[in-house]
Amino acid sequence: MSKNLKLFTVGNFEFRLQHLLIIGILSLAFSISMLIRSQGADYGFELNEFDPFFNYRATEFIVNNGLVEYFNWHDDRSWYPYGRNVSETSQVMLHATAATLYPIFGMGADLYDFTIMFPVVFGSLSVIVIFA
């Protein structure tokens, strides 16, 4: 069977067998990565380890205070006894992206639940980006 077999046409686009294979492979890869990434939910819908808790706290800070205040935030609850300047010592884009997408895709969910699902969805979407 030829991979260039024409299946049907939509407008000027000819849908071929190779397109169906690519869609199938990407769907399978997305599904498998979603299953692997969400295995932690088998033990409860909780944040595990210390980094996710800090990422949640930093995202919550941006949601409550705004991005400008985040760049001025000196966190005295970490790096005892002096604290730290968060914007200089952490992943700014991770926190900013989660805080920006929360009002859009949060669908009324709690921020805590959103920060649990955020890495699962974005990790699975990265499979498609890597394929491209």
Where are these regions (language model features)?
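Start-transfer (signal-anchor) and selected internal transmembrane alpha helices
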Residues: 1-39, 50
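Acidic, glycine-enriched active-site microenvironments
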Residues: 33-34, 51, 83-84, 100, ...
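Short linear capping/connector segments at secondary-structure termini
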Residues: 18-22, 42-44, 73-84, 112-116
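Transmembrane-helix motifs of polytopic, lipid-linked glycan transferases
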Residues: 109, 113-132
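Active-site-adjacent bridging/hinge elements
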Residues: 29-35, 66-75, 105
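Extracytoplasmic catalytic/substrate-binding loops of multi-pass membrane glycan-assembly enzymes
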Residues: 44-58, 67-76, 86-97
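Asp/Glu-centered strand-loop micro-motifs enriched in Gly/Pro and often flanked by an aromatic residue
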Residues: 13, 42-47, 103-106
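Short hydrophobic/aromatic helix or loop-helix immediately within or flanking a transmembrane segment
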Residues: 62, 80-107
